[in-house]
Amino acid sequence: MNWWNSYQDAQLDQLIEEALRDSPNLAIAQARLNRAQAYTQVAGAPLQPQVSATAAAGVQRLSYNYLTPDATVLRGWNQVAQTALSMNWEIDFWGKYRSALAAATSELQASEAEQAQAVLVLTTALTASYAELARLFAQQATSQRAVEIRTQTSTLFRERFNHGLETLASVREADAKRAQAKTERLLIAEQIDLQRNRIAALLGAGPDRGRLIGAPKAAPSIKSGLPENLTMDLLGRRPDIVAARLQTQAFSSRIDQRQADFYPNINLVAFIGVQSLGLDRLSQGGSQFGAAGPAISLPIFTGGRLQGELRAAQATYDESVAIYNRTLIAALQEVADAITSIKALTGQLEQAELGLVAAREAFTMIAGRYRGGLANYIEVLIAEDIMLNSLRSVTELRARRLLLDVLLIRALGGGYQQQSQSPTANK
């Protein structure tokens, strides 16, 4: 089961399924993974013998006035033919190609981790956007409740005004607050439409798809909570950290590869075939030819090229280590921030809910006193403002629970598990 299934929201599951299928960002990550797989195949090729076949046939005429004495030169045009198999195998004494394969394998695994990171970024971004949509719908409900309360207060003031118990100024002030509540409701409706467009873009779809997104569940099930033990091992599962570590391993292998360039290359070379003067003699005995033996080459003077390539490999490795450390520090901060906010939210929500209960009771009492002529309209409006602000605060904090849960999941890597290392990566 994927982490987002724990929210038990069928619409969210459907949206993520669409995003994973159609997102251009994931298509880019998959293309990069395919490229890394191809490079790994290329890197492993030099460890195997390279065999090729050649065949040629044609006619030739030799000069009578060149290096060969005229009396021994064949006359006229003559048919010639040759077929051969050749083999070249560079013995990897110094581990040059094993290091290259190890580097390519680490880069392939890093690409796999980067693809997982792309999935994590997409799914958490989509779920966070969905959480924002849920918050906006909750605020819309709060705004509708505010319109209803403001309307009731305005009606109450107007009734008392009609009986000569209230001033026109108080009625108009209540009407203004009702209009303000309606304006807020319209603004939230606009924000909901804009948020739907953002979600549609994450799906790789147009605005028409966004209009089909309904209201999220009123209270998505949040079960992940804080892990019992937040260890570095758990943090090390983050795909971006895994990718950075694997890139560092790859660049370390590149250093070994460049160091091997300073040592002799030892090749086993062999070829065998048949050649003849005249096609009809190609298969006759005596047409065979061949050779076999080692070939050794040693770089003597390269103008500093090998030293420069080694220094560049070492500098690239140092850079990758710094990038890994930066990624790790950023991850630690993200986890710490998410945990701090989640822990703080519990107390904030508890106090906000207590404040809402008190504000509702105060508004009810003041409204009753106002009807009995024991309170003025200003007290009613102040109590009403306090109650509505408390309601908005509680709504915001309840909606924030889902967002913080998503942020913690992203900070911890979304349950990513690196695949076992391929044995070809071992030197």
Map each language-model feature to its residues:
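Bacterial Sec-pathway N-terminal export signals of envelope proteins
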Residues: M1-Y39, F137, A219-Q249, P299-I300, ...
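Small/polar, glycine/serine/threonine/aspartate-rich low-complexity segments that form flexible
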Residues: M1-Y7, E17, A57-S86, R209-P227, ...
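Amphipathic alpha-helical coiled-coil scaffold segments and their short linker/junction regions
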Residues: N5, L20, G76, A103, ...
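Sec/SRP-type N-terminal targeting helices
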Residues: A27-I28, G44, I91-V119, A169, ...
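Periplasmic alpha-helical coiled-coil/stalk elements that build and connect Gram-negative outer-membrane
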Residues: Y97, A113-L230, S341, L345, ...
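Acidic, low-complexity, intrinsically disordered peripheral segments
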Residues: P207-R209, P220-I222, I339, S393-K427
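C-terminal structured "cap/appendage" subdomains that terminate the fold
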Residues: F363-L402
